[in-house]
Swiss-Prot record:
Main location: virion
Catalysed reactions, semicolon-separated: RNA(n) + a ribonucleoside 5'-triphosphate = RNA(n+1) + diphosphate
Keywords of the record: DNA-directed RNA polymerase, Nucleotidyltransferase, Transcription, Transferase, Virion
Family to which this protein belongs: Belongs to the eukaryotic RPB7/RPC8 RNA polymerase subunit family.
The enzyme's E.C. designation: 2.7.7.6
A Pfam family that the UniProt record links to this protein: SHS2_Rpb7-N
Protein name per Swiss-Prot or TrEMBL: Putative DNA-directed RNA polymerase subunit L376
Source taxon at top rank: Viruses
Amino acid sequence: MAQQSLYFQTKLEDKVSLLPSQMVGNMENYLLENLEAKVKDKVTEHGIVLKVNRIIEYDYGIISKNNFSGTAIYRVKYECLICSPVKNLSIICLVENIVKGYIIAKNGPVIVAIPFNNIDSDKFQLTNGNIVYKNNSNNIQKGDYVKVSIINIKTNLNEKKITTIAKLLDMATNDEIKSYDNDQLLIVNGDVDDEQEFI
């Protein structure tokens, strides 16, 4: 099944360290705290983890014989809200800037660069260095909402943003703008209504 949304709930697995002083009665709280410090708001191999909702399970933990500090490594399965752009995914973005040859837009932690030569020519035209929407002859400008299709993704582990290259498809409809606003609330609140899971 193809991914249909930029934001979704999923289950992931990671290794989490606990110091000997954290291996006490509320160990699960320390596991959650250390897990969040490791993955929250950072680029991982799966995307950006926006919120760790809960720990599903964890193993007994392993202390390496070469580890003289007594730190144990636990394999933790957890449920989280993730932001994961993929190729050919259509998303709504807010135009933040227009620089020579590019529209720079954003959706949450995803920065979108749209080259002027990568626009839907049925809906837009390049006139005097501006991209003009053919339906109303207005120039694309800062503050506009646009619909794009992701072409390429650049990530660096542990960074807070994902950079993408996209094709400009259309101006966003009112319903799409409302959906974009809901996504921005989702980023802040960390809750999601649907139960989509991509594992």
